[in-house]
């Protein structure tokens, strides 16, 4: 029987927001701040919300306008308090307003008559990557790279089994030691979970730690094994709080009367076959997790590779684009996709394009076609979707860019304005340098194009992505130059300082 292992899961608390607070010499736990690109309009997603602002029921991935609206609601209540305490100021128009505001939670709690304000910090992705790297190096002072798995920019899994006897520490003590050093070096607070497998470590961090008191620095560390998991979480709701249990899965479970992990565990004792009928091979994972089991360890997750691969480009446009300008964006995205395939030495069998139309097409009253509902319950035209398959796998720009443009023309309604574009390269495989040829194929021309792509890629890698651009990228509405300066679709920003940002009242 294999020896029981001990895993840590560590999550940096509101990471992007915390970095912005620390760089401004502000307390990440008490400063009201959101990370969002306000220049993209209030529909932009908040990449992070500070803990104190979350306490006003603003979710971590809200749209900026949702945060704005919630703050207005809070301030409406606070203004009534200020009026009752005779601390509000009456303007010339006879309306009351706050005498002062604050973005600090402690100050706001001390004086309920103050208005709630907050900082909107533009994202600086390069800075976040730099801080994440610094924190990763802190972990490496205690464990080997072989025993740590970066799950995301702000979250890691660590197998600490062999280190506990070495350091003469418990898992809790080792976790606290690492988290304290991260806090000392960066000013960023972390939450940790300890488990007898990766799944339980993740749940200890995501669910259990959120319901225990924090220490004076805001640090929370929780532990789970199979027994305590069943005791603490078998009746926990909603099921979407559990790792790898999404809304679609939960909906199907609930249709069979399964509302908790305890329900699922009990159902599996007599209805296992039915679970496999519903979920296929994924039923095995669901059943294991219901009982608190997770067979995969550090070696397995590090060696995992998806069985099928695709590469995608997507963007939400800052405003509604007319059809001709949207086509320009599709060509730019296809070019980016081509360079990504070239750099990775991959080819694709087909591309899929999805076009999301703007709601103004319906709001204006002239649209009579098929519709769908967006996440906010608004009626919008039904998205356009299509795929084109190539004669042979390719990464040549002449094929990918031109075929993407033709596909756009074929599937879109030219009268409608566009807001979302997603382009996927499907079934990508290693480029073996083989062409499907016939009597009319100019193989020398194909080789020349491939060498040109590689040369352009070399220039971009050395001098920056904007070193070589097509003239079309300078046309009005083009986004490639801006996107080339981004990381993950968001501004790379500066590397330090954090002086930019707007105070919102």
Task: State the predicted function of each range.
Residues 405-461:
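C-terminal hydrophobic structural anchor segments
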Residues 29-31, 349, 384-386, 419-421, ...:
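A generic structural signal for short beta-strands and their flanking turns/coil linkers
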Residues 1-288, 295-298, 443-505:
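Gly/Gly-Pro- and Ser/Thr-rich, intrinsically disordered tail segments characteristic of DNA damage-repair
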Residues 153-156, 347-362, 424-432:
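Core structural elements
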Residues 190-194, 349-353, 419-421:
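A short glycine-rich, hydrophobically flanked beta-strand micro-motif that places a catalytic Asp/Glu
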Residues 2, 9, 241, 247-417:
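DNA-contacting surface of Y-family translesion DNA polymerases
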Residues 363-367, 433-437, 481:
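Short conserved micro-motifs at the rims of enzyme active sites and ligand-binding pockets
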Residues 156-162, 384-391, 435-441:
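Short, hydrophobic beta-strand segments
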């Amino acid at each position: 029987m294999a020896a029981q292992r001990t895993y840590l899961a560590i999550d940096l608390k509101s990471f992007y927001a915390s970095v912005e607070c620390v760089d401004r010499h502000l307390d990440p736990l008490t400063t009201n701040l959101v990370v969002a690109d306000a220049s993209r309009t209030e529909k932009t997603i908040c990449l992070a919300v500070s803990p104190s602002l979350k306490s006003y029921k603003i979710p971590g991935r809200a749209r900026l306008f949702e945060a704005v609206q919630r703050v207005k609601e809070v301030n409406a209540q606070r203004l009534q308090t200020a009026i009752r305490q005779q601390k509000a100021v009456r303007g010339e128009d006879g309306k009351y307003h706050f005498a002062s505001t604050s973005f600090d939670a402690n100050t706001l709690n001390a004086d309920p008559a103050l208005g709630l304000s907050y900082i909107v910090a533009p994202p600086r992705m390069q800075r976040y990557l730099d801080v994440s790297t610094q924190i990763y190096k802190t972990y490496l002072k205690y464990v080997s790279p072989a025993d740590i798995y970066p799950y995301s920019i702000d979250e890691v899994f660590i197998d600490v089994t062999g280190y506990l006897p070495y350091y003469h520490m418990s898992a809790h003590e080792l976790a606290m030691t690492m988290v304290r050093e991260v806090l000392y070096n960066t000013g960023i607070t972390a939450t940790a979970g300890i488990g007898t497998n990766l799944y339980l470590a993740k749940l200890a961090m995501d669910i259990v730690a959120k319901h225990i008191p924090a220490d004076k620095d805001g640090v929370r560390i929780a532990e789970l094994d199979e027994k305590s998991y069943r005791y603490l979480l078998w009746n926990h709701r909603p099921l979407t709080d559990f790792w790898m249990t999404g809304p679609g899965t939960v909906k199907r479970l609930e249709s069979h009367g399964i509302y908790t992990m305890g329900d699922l565990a009990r159902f599996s004792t007599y209805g296992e076959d039915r679970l496999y009928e519903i979920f296929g091979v994924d039923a095995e994972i669901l059943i294991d997790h219901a009982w608190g089991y997770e067979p995969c360890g550090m070696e397995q997750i590090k060696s995992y590779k998806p069985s099928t691969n695709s590469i995608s480009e997507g963007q939400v446009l800052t405003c509604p684009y007319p059809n001709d300008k949207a086509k320009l964006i599709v060509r730019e995205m296809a070019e980016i996709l081509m360079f990504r395939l070239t750099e990775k030495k991959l080819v694709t069998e087909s591309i899929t394009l999805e076009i999301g139309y703007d709601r103004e097409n319906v709001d204006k009253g002239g649209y009579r076609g098929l519709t769908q509902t967006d996440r906010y319950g608004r009626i919008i035209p039904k998205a356009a979707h299509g795929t084109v398959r190539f004669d042979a796998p390719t990464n040549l720009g002449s094929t990918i860019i031109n075929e993407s443009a033709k596909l756009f023309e074929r599937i879109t309604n030219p009268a409608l304005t566009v807001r979302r574009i997603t382009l996927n390269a499907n079934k990508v495989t290693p480029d073996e340098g083989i062409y499907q040829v016939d009597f009319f194929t100019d193989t020398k021309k194909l080789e020349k194009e491939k060498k040109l792509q590689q040369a352009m890629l070399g220039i971009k890698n050395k001098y920056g992505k904007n070193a070589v651009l097509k003239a079309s990228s300078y046309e009005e509405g083009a986004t490639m130059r801006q996107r080339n300066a981004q990381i993950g679709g968001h501004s790379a920003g500066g590397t330090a300082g954090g002086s930019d940002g707007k105070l919102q009242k």
